[in-house]
Amino acid sequence: RIIEQGTKEGFAVAAIDAFYKKEVKPTDKTLFPNATEYANNLRKILEKDDRFDKNKIFYTGFSYGAEQVLKTIGAPFNSQNPKAWKAVVAAEPGCNSFHQPVKLNFSMLIIKGEESHYYIEPCKILEKEMLKKGNNINIIVLPKANHYFSTNGKIGKGIAVNGCRDNPIIKKSDGSLQMYDGSKISRKEARKKCLTS
């Protein structure tokens, strides 16, 4: 839908398939590729092409792709890529783990389904932390929509990163992890705590 509507509106839309030719199953959450890196490399290529306005490139992703979009809010990405995007949109992120926000040069929109099994609470916490840094962020909740609103709406079974609903994990700029309540946590403990089936 984004590709179709975007091109109708005159946008050039590049859809990245980070899973292309990778033997990764939806249950292999810890083996997923770094789609943010792919998107950022593509952005750098497009910026060199005179057909595109480098000041009007935005980044969006759905579900896992939305989690990849959330990587752009922290110091690790922003220190190396200032002013990378005009805006970012994360559609149905889990928000159970996110980088400690920094002041951004772009706006963010988060789209959530009201009935999603990736609950809204951690995204509200992320919004609060983003606002503390003076960022422009907005959350839109789609009534009666679940996580699969962009497809047929049929709920599947599998592993989800949704077990840190009220106390998400914050990735600090030094690479360490802590829970929202301030308690320290290891990567192994974080996976155990946040992954559910």
Predicted features by range, described:
Residues 6-24:
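Conserved alpha/beta-hydrolase
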Residues 28-50, 71:
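Alpha/beta-hydrolase active-site loop
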Residues 51-63:
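Alpha/beta-hydrolase fold nucleophile elbow
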Residues 66-79:
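Short glycine-enriched nucleophile-adjacent loop
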Residues 79-94:
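A conserved short beta-strand
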Residues 110-112, 142:
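Short beta-strand/loop motif that positions the catalytic acidic residue
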Residues 117-125:
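Conserved alpha/beta-hydrolase "acid-adjacent" motif
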Residues 136-197:
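C-terminal catalytic histidine-bearing segment of alpha/beta-hydrolase fold enzymes
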